């Protein structure tokens, strides 16, 4: 498991954690214009496990997250409830997510185990609110972890809202920041702020365009610092259309990891 000590985290340890995560999910043989890419969705192991830790060994609270290596989807997580491993899985989670976060647990999902919605942003926001209003940073992540760890999941209103906020923050700080250096760097800039980094229009448009941007990069058949035509619908920080970028800009400032693409230029 890749461990991220949330309580004692700094911008530097956060960056190291994301580097470890990219290493764990990347295709060991392929690059595209000098950028690493995720492995295929068929390669085993299927998951990388991430432990988010709060507190010292004896009293440590640990959330274990199951992330698909091939697409970086968060499929579920576990904590400890009533002194036992409790898995929490989305309506559309992979069927093996349960045993991935709670090994050997063959119980049928009950009210303590079901996240009552799908893993899309739209579904999470229906319970947790608009993600542009939720700050991303050490303080916001730790506070949401404390609000749900070991708590009764049947407390529909409060638990559901807190859990959805935790998921929205964790997904963006972990999987999206692994995909996009742009998001990683913005989170680092506000890492210790009480409010954290509220995703700007550029970040939000990146989050829904990972495959499209990766494919636009892969389509460029000339090496060097080419101009890349970006997919339609991308916005910059000021909500203006963002239509082109140089390959160097994408490599150095925007992309942390591509989706798995077929690419002529390594």
UniProtKB/Swiss-Prot annotation:
Keywords: Disulfide bond, Golgi apparatus, Hydrolase, Plant defense, Protein synthesis inhibitor, Secreted, Toxin, Vacuole. GO terms for molecular function: rRNA N-glycosylase activity; toxin activity. The keyword Nucleotide-binding does not apply. The keyword Hydrolase applies. GO terms for cellular component: extracellular region; Golgi apparatus; vacuole. Its main location: secreted. Disulfide bonds join 32-263, 85-102. It is an enzyme of class 3 (hydrolase). Pfam families: RIP (PF00161). Its EC number is 3.2.2.22. Nicks pBR322 dsDNA. Has adenine polynucleotide glycosidase activity on herring sperm ssDNA. Belongs to the ribosome-inactivating protein family. Type 1 RIP subfamily. This is Dioicin-2. It comes from Phytolacca dioica. The lineage of its organism: Eukaryota, Viridiplantae, Streptophyta, Embryophyta, Tracheophyta.
């Amino acid at each position: 498991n890749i461990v991220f000590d949330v309580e004692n985290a700094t911008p530097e340890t956060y960056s190291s954690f994301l580097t470890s995560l990219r290493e764990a999910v990347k295709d060991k043989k392929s690059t595209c214009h000098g950028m690493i890419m995720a492995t295929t969705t068929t390669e085993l192991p299927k998951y990388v496990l991430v432990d988010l830790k709060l507190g010292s060994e004896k009293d440590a609270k640990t959330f274990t997250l199951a992330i698909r290596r091939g697409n970086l989807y968060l499929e579920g997580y576990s904590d400890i409830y009533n002194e036992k491993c409790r898995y929490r899985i989305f309506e559309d989670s992979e069927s093996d997510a349960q045993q991935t976060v709670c090994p050997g647990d063959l119980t049928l999902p009950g009210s303590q185990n079901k996240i009552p919605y799908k893993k899309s942003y739209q579904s999470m926001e229906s319970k947790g609110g608009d993600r542009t209003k939720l700050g991303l940073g050490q303080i916001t992540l730790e506070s949401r972890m404390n609000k749900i760890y070991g708590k009764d999941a049947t407390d529909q209103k409060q638990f559901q809202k807190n859990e959805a906020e935790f998921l929205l923050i964790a997904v963006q700080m972990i999987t999206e920041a692994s995909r996009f250096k742009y998001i990683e760097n913005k989170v680092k800039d506000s890492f210790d702020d009480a409010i954290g980094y509220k995703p700007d229009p550029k970040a939000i448009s990146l989050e829904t365009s990972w495959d499209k941007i990766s494919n636009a990069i892969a389509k460029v058949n000339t090496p060097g610092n080419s101009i890349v035509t970006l997919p339609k619908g991308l916005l910059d920080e000021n909500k203006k259309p963002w239509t082109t970028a140089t390959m160097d800009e994408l490599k150095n400032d925007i992309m942390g990891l591509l989706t798995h693409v077929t690419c002529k230029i390594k």
